[in-house]
Structures are given as structure tokens and as C-alpha cells.
Regions:
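Short beta-strand and beta-hairpin "edge-sheet" elements
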Residues: 96-130, 134, 138
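Polar/acidic, low-complexity leader/linker segments enriched in S/T/G and N/D
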Residues: 1-42
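Oligomerization/assembly interface segments of phage tail-like spikes and tubes
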Residues: 50-71, 113, 128-142
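Family-specific signature for flavin-dependent thymidylate synthase
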Residues: 62-68, 76-80, 89
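Intrinsically disordered, low-complexity terminal/linker regions enriched in Pro/Ser/Gly
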Residues: 143-158
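Short amphipathic beta-strand and strand-loop transition segments with alternating hydrophobic
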Residues: 34-50, 114-123
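Short conserved beta-strand and strand-loop elements enriched in small hydrophobics
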Residues: 9-13, 84-100
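Edge/loop elements at the starts and ends of beta-strands within beta-rich repeat scaffolds
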Residues: 52-54, 79-83, 102-104, 126-128
Length: 158
């Protein structure tokens, strides 16, 4: 079984824009997030205060996938070299039918998938082989979503 690197971070990845599909997100279309981090660049003045536009950065994340058909989407995104959305949903609850009920907050990212690495692990409890997929993408947009607010962080290209 793949070790959970972040036992206190309850996050799932939905390979689309959560704001566009709303409550029609099905749990079977989500992936368990093991870890993620992103980095953006911004100029700072002598006092250390940020100013100006945010420059392109990157996002790296690792997810657990089971089966070949579940991770082909990520390779397709890399092959097509298109600006694609991914939604990180934190502390989500799902209904008995598998649809999303509620979530604490989220992060919608847009960018270009530039690298994918795989780590194979033992089988899960159902005898299915699991993969840990490490994805790196160049960011174009970050959108923070929460219970009461949506905040767009626009990234510019230099």
C-alpha cells in the first residue's frame, strides 16, 4: 500500500475546473493527493513588500492512481501541450451517491503539464496495483476558492 505522506491534509484532485462543474463532481473521478507545492515569482521592494505582476511558476503534485485508464488523462494533457485546469479540493465530503456535498476550500490551477514520473507500489486491499504519479506543470493561473470567496491570482508571462 502506498504510504500517505500527508496524513492530516485531506485533499483530492479533480482533473477539471471545479467552478465550472459545481456539485456534479463525482468521487470516482477524483484522485487522492499525497503532496503538492507551487512556486511563483514576484518582485519585492527594499522593505520586502511585493509589487508588480506575478511571474510564471510551477506546480508539482503527487497522486495515487489505480489502473491504466485512470492516469492516461495526464499524459494526454502533456502530449497536447494545452493550458489545462486541475482542482485541489480540501476536506471534501461526498454524498452516498458519490457526489460532492461540501468542501472547506480549494485551489483551481491552470497550466501546462511538462513532466510526469511514476512510482509503482504494492497492490491495494482489492488486489489492484497502485501507482504514485508525480506531475509537474508550468502555471498560468491560480484561483483560490473557499466558503465565501473566490480570489484569482493572475500570473503573467515575461
Amino acid at each position: 500500500m502506498i504510504k500517505n505522506h500527508a496524513p492530516y491534509l485531506k485533499a483530492v484532485l479533480f482533473p477539471n475546473n471545479l467552478a465550472e462543474v459545481g456539485s456534479s463532481v463525482n468521487q470516482s473521478n477524483c484522485f487522492t493527493v499525497q503532496d503538492y507545492h507551487y512556486h511563483c515569482f514576484r518582485e519585492r521592494d527594499e522593505q520586502g513588500n511585493p509589487y508588480g505582476n506575478i511571474r510564471s511558476g510551477y506546480l508539482e503534485f503527487s497522486i495515487v492512481v489505480s489502473g491504466l485508464d485512470t492516469y492516461q488523462h495526464f499524459y494526454k494533457c502533456m502530449d497536447q501541450n494545452e493550458n489545462v485546469p486541475f482542482s485541489f479540493i480540501f476536506n471534501a465530503s461526498f454524498s452516498k451517491t458519490g457526489r460532492i456535498n461540501d468542501f472547506e476550500d480549494g485551489l483551481i490551477t491552470y497550466g501546462y503539464v511538462v513532466d510526469i514520473q511514476e512510482s509503482c507500489d504494492n497492490h491495494d486491499n482489492h488486489g489492484q496495483e497502485q501507482l504514485l504519479l508525480h506531475v509537474k506543470m508550468l502555471l498560468s493561473n491560480l484561483i483560490f476558492i473557499g466558503n465565501e470567496q473566490i480570489h484569482l491570482l493572475e500570473i503573467t508571462k515575461d
